[in-house]
């Protein structure tokens, strides 16, 4: 099963935080920060304007992005955790 977001939504695979600190201390799940970076794995077709024309999204598959801590909805497809959100919830592309 594959996943294709609709309209102006994108699917992001979060880039997980390190399990250990540089000093070797293991960080438990209860204190880990929620990821705010990820890789775009799927994009919708775009959004319609008032004239009915579809404007494609700026983001593309493979872009590394920064997004809000509480943005989107978490889903799981074939054991892979993804976050689905609107393109406007993304702050920017990481180069």
UniProtKB/Swiss-Prot annotation:
Pfam families: Cpn10
Chaperone among keywords: yes
GO MF annotations in UniProt: ATP binding; metal ion binding; protein folding chaperone; protein-folding chaperone binding; unfolded protein binding
A cellular component annotation (GO) from this entry: cytoplasm
Gene Ontology biological-process entries: chaperone cofactor-dependent protein refolding
Quaternary structure (record): Heptamer of 7 subunits arranged in a ring. Interacts with the chaperonin GroEL.
UniProt similarity note: Belongs to the GroES chaperonin family.
Name of the protein in its database record: Co-chaperonin GroES
Organism of origin: Rickettsia rickettsii (strain Sheila Smith)
